[in-house]
From Swiss-Prot:
This is Cytidine deaminase. Its cofactor is Zn(2+). Its EC number is 3.5.4.5. It is an enzyme of class 3 (hydrolase). GO terms for molecular function: cytidine deaminase activity; identical protein binding; zinc ion binding. It comes from Escherichia coli O1:K1 / APEC. Belongs to the cytidine and deoxycytidylate deaminase family. InterPro entries: APOBEC/CMP_deaminase_Zn-bd, CMP_dCMP_dom, Cyd/dCyd_deaminase_Zn-bd, Cyt/Deoxycyt_deaminase, Cyt_deam_dimer, Cytidine_deaminase-like, Cytidine_deaminase_bacteria. Keywords: Hydrolase, Metal-binding, Zinc. The lineage of its organism: Bacteria, Pseudomonadati, Pseudomonadota, Gammaproteobacteria, Enterobacterales. GO terms for biological process: cytidine deamination.
């Protein structure tokens, strides 16, 4: 079991501990539960889906990286496939506040970058901030997404974001988590190709500036993040954050990164290079390359 889970795990009910122990035994537990695993946990504990998601939130929050706030938020995004995806907030010393990742963004990106097609619900241990409510409104589940909070009845996103402004106001038809492929040829080594593939999946209807980041760890594992724009612009999630979300949730740490590649267009209206390289250097990675989409 990864050390970060030990405290939260010890506080779970005995029957949930017993059912989870073989799942969490792997140090690199992928921070997700398949539909089959969810069903098994429900049978072992007698909990329904909502109660089980609440019970698991401390494990999601244990994935948080909060050196600034020490305020750990956990989220569980429930995919329509039946898979549940953990998420947690992340803060980066030496970078800027704007590079911060919120727990809801983490769980949603985890699902999206894992190939999930849509979300049915999201469970969070604290009420979503306005930034996250706006981020969620970019999803193809839209205002119907169910939000579950401890001690409250579940409500749709529309109840938390009345009179919402979103992609439909800008006549955007392709939404976040819809399948997208921008068709750039995969060239270069494996890490470059992973970055280009991530750029091909970008959701960037507003700037038309595709980008993707791929991180290679010392053991050869590669984590890729795609750019995810938002109708309100500021809640946009950069591609580096997508890759860092996966790296963190899968049990790796920043010193494990040995090389990074950013893929983007040289003449794009928005350029990720400066922010990406600055944040990576703050995390200790100086081996950073840029490949140009053509």
């Amino acid at each position: 079991m990864h050390p970060r889970f030990q405290t939260a795990f010890a506080q779970l009910a005995d029957n949930l501990q017993s059912a989870l122990e073989p799942i969490l035994a792997d140090k690199y537990f992928p921070a997700l539960l398949t539909g089959e695993q969810v069903s098994s946990l429900k049978s072992a504990t007698g909990l329904d889906e909502d109660a089980l998601a609440f019970a698991l939130l401390p494990l999601a929050a244990a994935c948080a990286r909060t050196p600034l706030s020490n305020f750990n938020v956990g989220a569980i995004a429930r995919g329509v496939s039946g898979t549940w995806y953990f998420g947690a907030n992340m803060e980066f010393i030496g970078a800027t506040m704007q590079q911060t990742v919120h727990a809801e963004q983490s769980a949603i990106s985890h699902a999206w970058l894992s190939g999930e097609k849509a979300l049915a619900a999201i469970t969070v241990n604290y009420t979503p901030c306005g930034h996250c409510r706006q981020f969620m409104n970019e999803l193809n589940s839209g205002l119907d997404l169910r939000i579950h909070l401890p001690g409250r009845e579940a409500h749709a996103l529309r109840d938390y974001l009345p009179d919402a402004f979103g992609p439909k106001d800008l006549e955007i038809k392709t939404l976040l988590m819809d399948e997208q492929d921008h068709g750039y040829a995969l060239t270069g080594d494996a890490l470059s190709q992973a970055a280009i593939a991530a750029a091909n999946r970008s959701h960037m209807p507003y700037s038309k500036s595709p980008s993707g980041v791929a991180l290679e760890c010392k053991d050869g594992r590669i984590f890729s993040g795609s750019y995810a724009e938002n109708a309100a612009f500021n809640p946009t999630l950069p591609p580096l954050q997508g890759a860092l979300i996966l790296l963190n949730l899968k049990g790796y740490d920043y010193p494990d990164i040995q090389r990074a590649v950013l893929a983007e267009k040289a003449d794009a209206p928005l350029i990720q290079w400066d922010a990406t390289s600055a944040t990576l250097k703050a995390l200790g990675c100086h081996n950073i390359d840029r490949v140009l989409l053509a």
